From Swiss-Prot:
Protein name, entry field: Neurogenin-1
GO biological process, one term: hindbrain morphogenesis
Compartment annotation: Nucleus
Domain bHLH: start-end pairs: 70-122
Signal peptide residues on this chain, from the entry's feature table: none
Pfam families: HLH (PF00010)
SUPFAM superfamilies: HLH, helix-loop-helix DNA-binding domain
Amino acid sequence: MEIVYSDMETSSCDYSFSHTDDEDSRSSLHPASPASSCGKPPASPAGLQQKKRRRGRARNETTVHVVKKNRRLKANDRERNRMHNLNDALDALRSVLPAFPDDTKLTKIETLRFAHNYIWALSETIRIADQKQGKSRDGPLLLPGLSCMADAPSPGSDSCSWPSGASSSSSSPSYCNSDPGSPAAMDDFGYLQTDVVYSYRNFVPSIY
């Protein structure tokens, strides 16, 4: 009886060993997934793609935000530099404008208006000087009273006499009728310039 029991135990052990070999082969053919081992269902390919898209969107939004911030900072720097250059140019313009003390503060528009009027006054002065220079080249280089005396036909003639009721002759020049002592005759070159300077100075008190 002992021999029979021992044979049965040996056969049962062999059967158990063969069963474990079958289980090992099955486990090697079908490996367990990490999700199933943890008790979670496996993720589908569609879910993985959605996660990748979300990550890409988050990265894109972050990049766009950084780019917008950099552009805004660069635009602010450009505007700041432009205003600094404009203020420097206006300060240089104020330094060359006349009739203003050093402590006078002018706004931008007042500085530009005053510079416009100052340039206009200078251009008018140059234009009047050119006109007078052209007239002096055409006519005799003498004062009005002296030219009248030089063009007189005779000392006793009435053609160049000063205005005393007698009519002038046709041979006398047109400027013989002016009084040599009058400001219009002596300051013929400067009376228009005086008007220009007067109109220019009328602008100065309105700025203060």
